[in-house]
Amino acid sequence: MASLKIKYAAIIISSLIAGGLISVTAWQYLNSSQKTVPAEQKAPEKKVLFWYDPMKPDTKFDKPGKSPFMDMDLVPKYADESGDKSSGGIRIDPTQVQNLGLKTQKVTRGMLNYSQTIPANVSYNEYQFVIVQARSDGFVEKVYPLTIGDHVKKGTPLIDITIPEWVEAQSEFLLLSGTGGTPTQIKGVLERLRLAGMPEEDIQRLRSTRTIQTRFTIKAPIDGVITAFDLRTGMNISKDKVVAQIQGMDPVWISAAVPESIAYLLKDTSQFEISVPAYPDKTFHVEKWNILPSVDQTTRTLQVRLQVTNKDEFLKPGMNAYLKLNTQSQEMLLIPSQAVIDTGKEQRVITVDDEGKFVPKQIHVLHESQQQSGIGSGLNEGDTVVVSGLFLIDSEANITGALERMRHPEKTENSMPAMSEQPVNMHSGH
């Protein structure tokens, strides 16, 4: 009986041991199965479409390796990086965006501020240029001590002359006046004296004193500087001989060559500031200005002429001067100039749409000043443009065909040449 109990106990213990072994084995099997299932269900390895050089993204390669253009490794382009090709935008991993240090800015509406300094030069005012002549034949009795470059005031004596024609006409006047000549005859003689060049003050003296004058003084008709004076005492003088040339000094002209691209900004005298190196602390008042009608064919500039007050004669003809232009454009859309990609053939920017995609857009830049560009078309107020990190995004847009979709929005994906190009065989020709 005791041996029977021992036999039953041994069977029970053996059964328990066998059950435990089966349980452990089953648990290990199930655990290992659970671990292998995810491994088997892992996503397949990304498919590489081609390799490219980020510095020249329009060329594709069929193998990895060194770029033939730059000393750098080619970068793979994966199939799942192309994004939604039905739209013009591309997606970039947020981590990469952060690493690139991308900065964006809203498109605003405002006016471009211009502040440009242009070299200029001082010249005589040609409206204040006179030629002094006797207008009758005679000879020089006296030359006053003057020469080229001397300043003269209006009424300053230049020369004393004797002119027989004037003496003869005076005699005729006195004869008609004393013998009952008609008013018309007397008036005609006086008018002949004026046309012959006799100074008006000498004519009035003749009428008041009734005395013939034989010596006359030619005087300066304006304030200015003598620019021609070549007479000597005792010289004969003909009626077409120049006694003197005198240039006025107040006001003077200041001329500057202004780029024709900013001619539309010239509005009124308040936008001009004049300075000269000789008197850096002086300011000068611009009375009026005008743009000359022709454009310099070589420099493509317009000639701007300003009439500047010069009462103290600080401004000397021939001086260097500087014309500072301070003005504003009309209101337009504005973006930072660094946001513009200008290839010479097209101008574009990278915008960010509501979904966070980067979308290239063609634009037309009207004007640029002080790192701001005025936009004529392609953007709307409130759009977001990328202002830094442009290069890599633009390269990505080129690779994914976004630029082609921008240029040819009517084409389908299959007809886009940028996406249908075959990768270059890195080993061809070897």
UniProtKB/Swiss-Prot annotation:
One term of GO molecular function: antiporter activity
Record keywords: Antiport, Ion transport, Plasmid, Signal, Transport
Positions of the UniProt region annotated as Disordered: 407-430
Any one biological process term the GO annotation gives: response to toxic substance
Biased composition (Polar residues): 414-430
InterPro entries: CusB_D23, HMBD, MFP_Cation_Efflux, RND_pump_MFP
Gene3D superfamilies hit by this protein: 2.40.30.170, 2.40.420.20, 2.40.50.100, 6.10.140.730
Protein name: Putative membrane fusion protein SilB
Annotated organism of origin: Salmonella typhimurium
